[in-house]
Amino acid sequence: MTLRLPLELREAVTEEARVKGDLARIVLFALSHVDRKDMEIQQTRKAGLPLCSPQLLHVGAEARTALREWAEEEGVSVNAIVVSVLEEFFKRLKRSKALREELRLEIRARRGFLPS
């Protein structure tokens, strides 16, 4: 799946993502920590947000299917769903030191062994 993030959001994600695959881990973690009912989906194209260059996102078939279904229900793109989820998640992340630490532990746990 191809993802285009607004520049500010891309910078926030980059602060947490250190190696290849971390973006997908962050998206999956954010999806599990944001309540779908409370989400306000923001259109990325129509809002005229400056977007970064496209990047590939590998979240797995189950998550991809769930994102597509959600996007169809809302009548928006999958990119708009992911951007909205990440923006809401990073608002919470800035306010919660515990959530930030939980994310970092989750990322480290999922990386597995990295040679030094």
Each language-model region and where it sits:
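Surface-exposed, Lys/Arg-rich phosphate-binding patches that contact polyanionic backbones
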Residues: P6-I26, A61-A80, S84, E102
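Short, basic amphipathic alpha-helical segments that act as recognition/interaction helices
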Residues: G21-T44, V76-R100
